[in-house]
């Protein structure tokens, strides 16, 4: 079995989007998205979009529980295929809370989603502070210092944040933007 290339998956998803609306799917749009999910069950953007559209669309001849079961399966598949990404976990958490009346599971999914998003934010901020620090212009050093202050408040225990902020402060002091620490 040959696997679809990424550009093919994106093109098929674009064609499916053009066959309907973002707020209520056409039968052709749902068919195209389902075919893509069948052909590439790990393509998370399609799984999430199909699940979202199914929640917004009343399909003729499909009872509510049947639709909810398909949506739940798609969301669980998206969570698994995405390596438990924050967006997929968040969608499953909302679904579980609203449609499955399972507050304990919903809470755990919301917490896992938040923790995943925070890890991504911490790493993104550390990378951005480091990038700006390495640019070594007054403007980028000032941006690094400003973001560093926020990052330290949000992630006070993060060794990575503490390291890049300390480096930014050292370079800013050498550039005359901060008083030098004379140890």
Question: Residue ranges of each PLM-predicted region?
Answer:
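Terminal, low-structured helical/coil segments at or just beyond the last alpha-helical repeat
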Residues: 1-4, 139-183
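Short amphipathic alpha-helical segments that mediate assembly, nucleic-acid/protein binding
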Residues: 6, 26-30, 141
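Short coil/turn connectors between adjacent alpha-helices in alpha-solenoid helical repeat scaffolds
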Residues: 15-25, 55-68, 96-106, 132-143, ...
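Alpha-solenoid helical repeat scaffolds
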Residues: 30-34, 69, 76, 111, ...
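Structural marker of alpha-solenoid helical repeat scaffolds
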Residues: 39, 81, 115-117, 154
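Helix-adjacent hinge/juxtasegments
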Residues: 64-88
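Long amphipathic alpha-helical scaffold regions
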Residues: 74, 112-121
């Amino acid at each position: 079995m040959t696997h679809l290339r990424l550009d093919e998956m994106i093109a098929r998803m674009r064609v499916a989007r053009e066959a309907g609306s973002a707020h209520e799917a056409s039968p052709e749009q749902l068919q195209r998205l389902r075919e893509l999910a069948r052909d590439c069950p790990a393509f998370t953007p399609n799984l999430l979009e199909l699940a979202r559209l199914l929640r917004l669309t009343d399909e003729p001849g499909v009872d509510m529980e049947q639709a909810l079961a398909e949506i739940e399966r798609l969301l669980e598949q998206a969570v698994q295929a995405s390596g438990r990404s924050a967006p997929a976990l968040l969608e499953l958490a909302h679904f579980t809370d609203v449609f499955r009346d399972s507050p304990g599971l919903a809470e755990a999914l919301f917490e896992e989603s938040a923790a995943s998003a925070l890890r991504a934010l911490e790493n993104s901020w550390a990378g951005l502070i480091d990038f700006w620090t390495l640019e070594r212009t007054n403007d980028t050093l000032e941006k690094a210092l400003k973001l560093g202050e926020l990052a330290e408040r949000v992630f006070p225990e993060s060794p990575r944040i503490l390291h890049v902020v300390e480096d930014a402060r050292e370079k800013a002091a050498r550039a005359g933007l901060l008083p030098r620490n004379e140890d």
